[in-house]
């Protein structure tokens, strides 16, 4: 596997990647505002979008000590950003990282993963979909949202209805 030999083999053998993602968090990032920019463009063009949330390979996650709790919290935060604005076509595969052959490496889908995606993409593309109705909210550009700790998501949802 080219990815393994060129990118991971040496690092794995020396142990440099062991626990290296222990303090990594996807939940607090300016990229939530970047994502909002994409969503605004989809809404402006009235584009019906199917979002796919892929898993992380569970063995990789364990080896690098990437927090399962943090990944679930990221999942909740991105779902809220999407669904609160009317983006309801979401294929959430984030719980499939432990399924054999679902992933080919750390973050890339394997044949089972692509089969799962195809089973959702095919009907989305081949069947008539209802016209989307988006209600965009500029609060997702705010630093408050970008840096919102997952522990405050429920409170944020209540105060920003």
Where are these regions (language model features)?
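Extended hydrophobic/aromatic segments used for targeting, binding, or gating
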Residues: 27-33, 38-104
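Secreted/periplasmic serine-hydrolase-like ester/acetyl group-modifying domain
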Residues: 1-45, 137-161
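C-terminal regions of proteins
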Residues: 76-161
